[in-house]
Amino acid sequence: MSQIKLIVGLANPGTKYEDTRHNAGEWLINEIARQFNVSLKEEAKFFGKVAKINAAGGEVRLLVPTTFMNLSGKAVGALANFYRIKPEEILVAHDELDLPPGVAKIKQGGGHGGHNGLKDIIASLGNSNNFYRVRIGIGHPGSKELVAGYVLGKPSPQDQEKINAAVDEAGRCVDLLLKDGITKATNRLNAFKA
């Protein structure tokens, strides 16, 4: 596996959205920033909030785009081009409808599953979907028509507790991934259930 050089947390900007399900990716970046004791700072040229951490294999950038979700690729593309980071050196954390709250999984590649943030990132990386993902389960509202409102809604207190537990575990697994590689981290996170 390539060394991960960029970890992205997908979100919509502004306080109106910070507690919504669609911002679960940002919750993970905040957890990693806490672990490494760094603060994200707004960087206009990368259309996002950025921090740098030093992990076992070298420098890793953290990024939360401050564009809206469907323009996330603008931020990822700008930072990846500037630092010459390849798709397989990128880990994207995002909310996942197909996993229940309390579960998170690591995987490489795959489609966007209708997730507009992933769709835009794939396009911005020259149609490459070869990056890694941390899929943070938020559950599914049951019907396609309800999805748009659901992802922009706040989880129930019980679901939030489970999502927080999965985000905490994902944070520990990202640390493991940076130290020991993808396999150990994937096996550990994929077995977790809050």
From Swiss-Prot:
Coiled-coil parts of chain: none
Task performed by this protein: Hydrolyzes ribosome-free peptidyl-tRNAs (with 1 or more amino acids incorporated), which drop off the ribosome during protein synthesis, or as a result of ribosome stalling. Catalyzes the release of premature peptidyl moieties from peptidyl-tRNA molecules trapped in stalled 50S ribosomal subunits, and thus maintains levels of free tRNAs and 50S ribosomes.
Annotated site, Stabilizes the basic form of H active site to accept a proton, chain positions: D95
Protein name (database record): Peptidyl-tRNA hydrolase
Protein's GO biological process: protein quality control for misfolded or incompletely synthesized proteins; rescue of stalled ribosome
GO cellular component terms, semicolon-separated: cytoplasm
The organism's taxonomic lineage, starting at the top: Bacteria, Pseudomonadati, Pseudomonadota, Gammaproteobacteria, Pasteurellales
Residues of the site described as Discriminates between blocked and unblocked aminoacyl-tRNA: N12
Active site (record annotation): H22 (proton acceptor)
Disulfide bonds: none
Gene: pth
Residues binding tRNA, per UniProt: Y17, F68, N70, N116
UniProt GO MF annotations: peptidyl-tRNA hydrolase activity; tRNA binding
PROSITE patterns in the record: PEPT_TRNA_HYDROL_1, PEPT_TRNA_HYDROL_2
Family indicated by similarity: Belongs to the PTH family.
Keyword flag Cytoplasm: yes
Keyword annotations of the record: Cytoplasm, Hydrolase, RNA-binding, tRNA-binding
